[in-house]
Amino acid sequence: NYTSALNWPNENDYRFKSFWPADLHLIGKDITRFHAVYWPAFLLSAGIEIPKKIFAHGFILNKGEKMSKSLGNIEDPMELVDTFGVDQLRYFLMREAVFGNDGNYSDELLINRVNSDLSNDLGNLSQRCLSMVNKHCNKKVPEKNSLNDIDHELLSLPEAKIEKIFDMMDKFQINSYIEEVFYIVSK
């Protein structure tokens, strides 16, 4: 079980002390009853603290269907990483799979999301910023004291949203957090 991997029942072991109780026990929605009812009862009966939070995530659907070996529609994550890149795959899953709900996957959806958000929006913003620094700032990022009012206004956007963003992260609303980031990117 999870605690024996941390050298339990030796509660003085550094692994157990460092990692238990879990701040978050992340599980699939199909095993919620066991992990939210029975597992905590087992832990309590053994005198072990229960995880601080339990969160059940949805499934990643392949073209609208639950992935299944018998259906033959499973995607090998390592092949996806080799094809698209680990950061692109992580971004896609965090953006498209709303925690607690199912999310759809297809190569086409991944390619479109990465091209739209990362290449077009974020990539174009980066290119425009670097071009402006090159053209108007003698190829050096300007010091903060040399910025104008518009610069300061743009830089204040993330600061104004920081509390909202922390709240989203605490509630596992990662996709909403990403939407806030891309709202700022669009400005």
What are the roles of these predicted feature ranges?
Residues D121-N124, R128, E153, L157-A160, ...:
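Charged, amphipathic alpha-helical oligomerization/scaffolding segments
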Residues C129-V133, C137-K140, M169, Q173:
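Long, hydrophobic, amphipathic alpha-helical segments used as structural scaffolds
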Residues K164-E179:
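Acidic, serine/threonine- and proline-rich low-complexity regulatory regions
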Residues N1-K135, Y177-F182:
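Structured secondary-structure scaffolds
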Residues C137-F166:
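Acidic, turn-prone loop/beta-hairpin segments
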